């Protein structure tokens, strides 16, 4: 059940998580540039960096970068394949440790979670954060950074200021002093495109956005304005739910070594992706309600289309046929670089 508005919210973010898990498995690589992604082969086409150690980041390597580009920037790096099972096990261990502390914990992924310190408790948030860092490091060998505030969005921003391996607290008292001169892109949910549109209005900083007339923003951007103004002024979501996170969908995608031009190859790939994804759904005792297919062409044009099933199902014939039907909704008149299947769940 959701808690009452907490006195403090702590955002716990594991540092360079995937790389850190790999370093625990390969201690001989400590202090060296490590890059995780694909099958660990930097010559493999169309595979990207999933995570880079801080030593690799010093060379400009970033998540999402093609492995080949990463290899050029940091030729001495060690490349390792992704190991989701190991990351999932490490994440579950950390979450269990957080819950053992007795606070509500809301998990947001492998490497991050929110923890609420409720009103009326004498616990000092800095001391709680220090205890969290100590427990996680001693029990798992993983380092984390922790942001502290009175809402989720501000706590997450504080975590970015705490990295790596630190603690940072943002409050009403220091919000504008710390954030006022930063670009609006520093706010959660404000991306590069929005930043450019705001710049055309002469709005470049968090301070300027916080003091912009709401009518001007509403006429330009619509209803999302209220959220931006809330974030710019340091506001945000104060609810931390201790309910277990339940996935709403399962998905798989594949980037092909060469672009596909043959429709039968595309159909085979979509069928295999649908079956693989369905196997995971069945293993988790869920049922499928909608089937989505994503197509990315050689020009990186990306579209997703979706179909609702007549009734929830886990029948392989129904699911794979639905995936092929959705694929048929695309013209497929250009070479295809990537295909993905997402199954939405009841």
From Swiss-Prot:
One of its GO terms (molecular function) is damaged DNA binding. Its EC number is 2.7.7.7. It is an enzyme of class 2 (transferase). Mg(2+) binds at residues 13, 111. The record marks 18 as: Substrate discrimination. Its cofactor is Mg(2+). GO terms for biological process: DNA-templated DNA replication; error-prone translesion synthesis; SOS response. It is found in: Cytoplasm. It catalyses: DNA(n) + a 2'-deoxyribonucleoside 5'-triphosphate = DNA(n+1) + diphosphate. GO terms for cellular component: cytosol; plasma membrane. Binds 2 magnesium ions per subunit. The active site is at residue 112. NCBIfam families: PRK03352.1. Poorly processive, error-prone DNA polymerase involved in untargeted mutagenesis. Copies undamaged DNA at stalled replication forks, which arise in vivo from mismatched or misaligned primer ends. These misaligned primers can be extended by PolIV. Exhibits no 3'-5' exonuclease (proofreading) activity. May be involved in translesional synthesis, in conjunction with the beta clamp from PolIII. This is DNA polymerase IV 2. It comes from Mycobacterium tuberculosis (strain ATCC 25618 / H37Rv).
């Amino acid at each position: 059940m959701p808690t009452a508005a907490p006195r403090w919210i702590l955002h716990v973010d594991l540092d360079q998580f995937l790389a850190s898990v790999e370093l625990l498995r390969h201690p001989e690589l400590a202090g060296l540039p490590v890059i995780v992604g694909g099958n660990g082969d930097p010559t493999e086409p169309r595979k990207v960096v999933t995570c880079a150690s801080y030593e690799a980041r010093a060379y400009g390597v970033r998540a999402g970068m093609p492995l080949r580009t990463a290899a050029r920037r940091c030729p001495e790096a060690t490349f390792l394949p992704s190991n989701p099972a190991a990351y999932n096990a490490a994440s579950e261990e950390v979450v269990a440790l957080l819950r053992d502390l007795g606070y509500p914990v809301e998990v947001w992924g492998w490497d991050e979670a929110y923890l609420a310190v409720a009103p009326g408790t004498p616990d000092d948030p800095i001391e709680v954060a220090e205890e969290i860092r100590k427990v996680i490091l001693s029990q798992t060998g993983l380092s984390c950074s922790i942001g502290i505030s009175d809402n989720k969005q501000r706590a997450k921003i504080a975590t970015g200021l705490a990295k790596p391996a630190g603690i940072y607290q943002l409050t009403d008292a220091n919000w504008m002093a710390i954030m006022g001169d930063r670009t609006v892109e520093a706010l959660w949910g404000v991306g590069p495109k929005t930043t450019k549109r705001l710049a055309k209005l002469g709005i470049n900083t968090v301070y300027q956005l916080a003091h912009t007339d709401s009518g001007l923003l509403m006429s330009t951007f619509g209803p999302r304005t209220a959220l931006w103004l809330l974030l710019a002024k340091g506001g945000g979501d104060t609810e931390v739910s201790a309910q277990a996170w339940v996935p709403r969908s399962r998905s798989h995608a594949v980037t092909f070594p060469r672009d596909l031009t043959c429709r039968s190859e595309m159909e085979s790939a979509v069928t295999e992706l649908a079956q693989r994804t369905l196997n995971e759904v069945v293993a988790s005792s869920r049922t499928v309600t909608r089937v989505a297919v994503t197509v990315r062409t050689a020009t990186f044009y990306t579209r997703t289309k979706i179909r609702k099933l007549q009734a929830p199902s886990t029948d392989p014939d129904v699911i794979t046929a639905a995936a092929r039907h959705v694929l048929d909704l695309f013209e497929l008149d250009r070479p295809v670089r990537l295909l993905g299947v997402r199954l939405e769940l009841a």
